[in-house]
């Protein structure tokens, strides 16, 4: 690992010194590279990078702003908190392309229609971003990622910051994100219940690779298309097999078991699980720097009060079981009203129905 890091640092230093000594030629091509989707959580939304090729000077580099190190100490905790450091790296484009072909991910190239001077400025800017004081940045899901970094660097060099969202409609960030996790039900569920109010705002910025790809098709710069050429470097042959285990049907089956069995032990397990999730969401809202996690109204569904309910169920405290059940049921009703019209309402509906049935049974049982 150390050897790889040293080699990378050497290459970065070499590329920076190289560009300082040799200006690019008129034949230089600068492209925005869009990588298609994959099945892992961190690759569900694609990837963006910049490519610079100059055959006269004999180099073909990719500038990748989506680098991170899984071996980072406390990686998961830092990612959750929102202070995980991503970094930029430049390396041979051939290696970049090979790795994504191996992963069977589509690769699209959009060549930017720039003057030689603009290309030189962008090239210099890219290499400046590789300096030790600039290369690391704090990742933010919507506001600062591989796509937004590429947009920011290009916009800083070009006049009037031409890369902006053109296809603005009434869609929210959540609605833009939702289809990407189709055929990955539990990832889709997890992503939507952990995100709070911010992702329900109107999506007015470009933050996803394929959205950037689509917008670049219609963006003009100096009265001409910003993209002069689009190439399909590699078209992945991906299948989307249906998995009943990773679907809403498996969730419904599990929830039906809790409804049918209807025992004290199953109620304890059910509400403990929901309550712990709610406790986690509450903690994340306070602990994390990710603004997407703030004001998470899904806490009304995964209510931390369920943990108190579990305690009183264990103690057979009829009075408090009824009181907390009523409070939680009212909270659930408020949640349902708030959720009307939201795209993820349908995927949490089985949990809403199951929780309502079990809470109602507890209330009615105590009344009898």
Language-model features: locations:
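Membrane-helix interface "capping/anchor" motifs
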Residues: 261-269, 311-323
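Glycine-rich catalytic cores of cysteine/serine-nucleophile enzymes that process amide/ester linkages
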Residues: 26-104
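Sec-dependent N-terminal signal peptides
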Residues: 4-14
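Positively charged n-region of N-terminal signal peptides that target proteins for export
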Residues: 1-5, 368
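Activation targets extended, charge/polar-rich intrinsically disordered C-terminal tails
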Residues: 128-306, 330-334, 341-368
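Boundary at the C-terminal end of the N-terminal hydrophobic targeting segment
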Residues: 17-21
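Membrane-helix boundary connector in multi-pass membrane proteins
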Residues: 314-323, 334-346
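A cross-kingdom signal targeting lumenal/periplasmic-facing segments of multi-pass membrane
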Residues: 69, 73-144, 148-157
């Amino acid at each position: 690992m150390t050897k790889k890091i040293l080699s990378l640092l050497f290459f970065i230093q070499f590329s920076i010194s190289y560009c300082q000594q040799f200006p690019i030629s008129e034949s230089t091509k600068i492209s925005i590279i869009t990588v298609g989707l994959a099945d892992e959580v961190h690759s569900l939304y694609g990837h963006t990078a910049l490519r610079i090729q100059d055959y006269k000077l004999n180099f073909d580099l990719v500038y990748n702003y989506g680098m991170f190190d899984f071996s980072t100490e406390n990686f998961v905790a830092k990612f959750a908190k929102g202070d995980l450091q991503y970094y930029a790296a430049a390396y041979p484009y051939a290696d970049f392309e090979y790795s994504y072909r191996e992963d069977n991910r589509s690769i699209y190239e959009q060549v930017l229609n720039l003057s030689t001077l603009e290309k030189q400025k962008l090239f210099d800017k890219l290499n400046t971003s590789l300096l030790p004081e600039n290369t690391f940045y704090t990742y933010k899901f919507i506001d600062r990622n591989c796509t937004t970094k590429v947009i920011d660097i290009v916009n800083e060099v070009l006049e009037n910051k031409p890369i902006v969202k053109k296809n603005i409609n009434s869609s929210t960030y959540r609605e833009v994100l939702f289809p990407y996790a189709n055929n990955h039900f539990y990832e889709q569920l997890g992503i939507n219940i952990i995100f709070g109010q911010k992702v329900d705002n109107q999506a007015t910025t470009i933050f996803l690779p394929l959205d950037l790809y689509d917008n670049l098709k219609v963006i003009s710069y100096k009265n001409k298309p910003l993209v002069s050429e689009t190439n399909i470097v590699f078209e992945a042959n991906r299948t989307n097999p249906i998995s009943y285990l990773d679907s809403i049907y498996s969730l419904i089956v599990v929830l039906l078991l809790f409804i049918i069995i209807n025992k004290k032990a199953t109620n304890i397990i059910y509400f403990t699980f929901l309550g712990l999730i709610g406790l986690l969401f509450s903690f994340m809202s306070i602990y994390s720097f990710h603004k997407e996690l703030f004001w998470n109204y899904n806490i009304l569904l995964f209510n931390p009060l369920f943990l108190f309910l579990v305690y009183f169920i264990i103690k057979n405290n009829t009075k408090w079981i009824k009181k907390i059940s009523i409070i939680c049921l009212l909270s659930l009703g408020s949640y349902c009203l708030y959720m009307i019209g939201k795209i993820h309402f349908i995927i949490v509906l089985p949990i809403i129905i199951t929780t309502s049935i079990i809470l109602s049974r507890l209330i009615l049982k105590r009344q009898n």
